[in-house]
Amino acid sequence: MNNKLLIIILMSVLGFASCGKENRSERIPEKEPPAGIDFPEDDGAKRLPADGALALRDLLAAVDPAKTLTQGETKITEKQFAEIKQFIDNNLKADSKIQTYNNIFNWIVKNVRYGSGNETIYLDPYDVFIHKVCVCQGYANLFKIMCQSQEIPAMCVNGWLVGVGGHAWNYAYVDKEWHVSDPTNGIDYKMEDTGKYRDMLQPIRADFNLFEDGKFAYNFEEGRLNVAEVKDSGLDYVLVPFSINGFRITSFCPVKKVSGTYDKLYLGSNVESVGENTVYLSSNFSTLREIDVDPANKFLTAYKNVLYNTGNDAPYFIPPAITRLELKPVKVIEKNFICRLENVEEIVFAEGTERIEAYAVEKCRNLRKVYVPSSVTYMDKDAIYDCGDKVEIVR
């Protein structure tokens, strides 16, 4: 009798708690419990400054300059590289590295010009070397290769020429210190003198990997310390670490294809971004179908394997390999709300959704069912578009 009474009381309490949740304005929790994974703990690592010039300065102080002796993203053949090196050896090489560096810089400033109008604009370093007409990226590419040919570590960076727009320039390491070199505009500073250039040159990415460990490679991307490459571990999940070399990792946006058996992603409290354009993550991590986020994360949250910016009910990122997509309630589902999810078979719009506009779901070729709640008062005839002719609308 006592056991039965206890069960009745327990059921009543649970029923009361459930009713209490139903009366709340937010029926879907912002945070979900972790799926049996230990998220990385805050280890006190430094978060990079929001100022790109200061952030890159801090990172480069911890980087082996020799890492920037590789060509990386810059396209050039061995024969072309040898020709440029021979030219410098014969004409610009001096007794000291710093004088050679200055000679290279001055030669580019004097001999290469910025293209305009209907001219052919060159970007690859050898083409710029031969034709001497380019835009800022061409200047930076040639300067990088010329420096590297003389064993002067150098890299290209992209970012903003403040007040003008997107820009490319260089960082080079000579005489045991980094220089910030902008051959397009004929200016050169020591990196430590940030006050002289940070209001003008704001880097947001660098063209090489800063750090590497047994599981990942890391770069400077979108002004953040980013997971750039994921190495095959034989596991089915990727757990983003909290830090590397004393710096907090705040971005997960691989720039190379993620290979191996991975289909799950776990983001700790440190990760703030998976890229401004999530197309890159979808393309490079095409096997991803599950996402979970540390409940302590203040920037991101996951619901039913969909990633959201905290406080925003519109999806930030939908895993490309997801097969059943369940969404938070959004009053109006706009055009291209869901697009090009080749693996999704079912979409569930949540109660609270009111309108589904034309082309809200587009080019999901394996879609079979769309669940539409009673709260939807308008659904355009083309709301589900170019998804084949086998889609069933379930109300």
Where are the regions that the model predicts?
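Sec-dependent bacterial lipoprotein signal peptides
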Residues: 1-17
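Active-site nucleophilic cysteine motif
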Residues: 100-104, 108, 132-147
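Short beta-strand/loop segment at the start of cytosolic alpha/beta domains
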Residues: 209-231, 310
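Structural signature of tandem-repeat unit edges
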Residues: 215, 220-222, 233-250, 260-275, ...
